[in-house]
Amino acid sequence: MQGIITKGIGGFYYIKTEDGLYECKARGKFRLDELTPMVGDKVEIEIDNNSKGTIEKIFERKNKLIRPAVSNISQAIIVFAFKNPNINLDLLNKFLLQCEYNEINAVVAFNKVDLVENPEKEEVVDIIKSAGYEVIYLNAKEGMGIEKIREKLKGNLNVLCGPSGAGKSTIINKLVGKDVMETGQISEKLKRGKHTTRHSELIEVEDGFLVDTPGFSSLSIEDIEKEEIQFLFPEFIKYINGCKFTGCLHYKEPSCVVKNALEQGKIHKKRYEFYIQIIEEKLRGKNNKW
């Protein structure tokens, strides 16, 4: 029987199958192979007479996140508030970079639309849309935009990510219709949210699954080669092969088609500046965790 791990606590794993939910333990062979079952894993299980099960096989993972420890994510809803806390554009770009690297479809949800006059005219919206990403506007407290999020979840294994205080837990509670996740208050001193989510669990919503991100995701460029970075910017792709020099990093090289596109306004200046920031970090040998 096949299913998906929705929760793991103290060596027990809860597997959602077509026949229902089963509590399972993992075979010892996984320990020998240094393979630990993760939430999101697609697995094969055997059920005993007491309706308990054993995980016999873990299928190959499409991707794997460390924080939260979740595998096979197909879509990320990146939640940022327009204000309280204010948007950190570098951080938003870093989330997008990680999504591209892990082959995760990214949708950007801007929450707290009531705090700005005209959400669609905010510069950050223009920057994100120019890169080809879908944008959803939310007032999660009032329930505005929640149905659009619900629609996006269908058929996907989804993760909500973004900075603390942006409204991730509020969104989950609205989607599920009950307080599954504790919501944190914004600290007046820091204007940042006190992070409150403490565990990873898949919640079934519509025809998909949703996991909230416990803690801040670990964002690192350590595993990304400098030559790979250009491919993580969707707006660069159609220009990359037109450059005069093979291996062009679109940095200081002449006859660069990406830089020409930038000059013509086809690539947003702030996205290109972020790209150069990452390239320079790699050239200096820095692999900072952000």
UniProtKB/Swiss-Prot annotation:
Question: Which leading EC class covers this enzyme?
Answer: hydrolase
Q: Which residues bind Zn(2+)?
A: C243, C248, H250, C256
Q: What Enzyme Commission number(s) does the record list for this chain?
A: 3.6.1.-
Q: Name one GO cellular component term.
A: cytoplasm
Cofactor(s) the record lists: Zn(2+)
Q: Which UniProt keywords apply?
A: Cytoplasm, GTP-binding, Hydrolase, Metal-binding, Nucleotide-binding, Ribosome biogenesis, RNA-binding, rRNA-binding, Zinc
Q: Which PANTHER family match?
A: SMALL RIBOSOMAL SUBUNIT BIOGENESIS GTPASE RSGA, SMALL RIBOSOMAL SUBUNIT BIOGENESIS GTPASE RSGA 1, MITOCHONDRIAL-RELATED
As for what it does, the entry says: One of several proteins that assist in the late maturation steps of the functional core of the 30S ribosomal subunit. Helps release RbfA from mature subunits. May play a role in the assembly of ribosomal proteins into the subunit. Circularly permuted GTPase that catalyzes slow GTP hydrolysis, GTPase activity is stimulated by the 30S ribosomal subunit.
This chain belongs to which protein, by name? Small ribosomal subunit biogenesis GTPase RsgA
Origin species = Clostridium tetani (strain Massachusetts / E88)
Q: Which gene encodes it?
A: rsgA
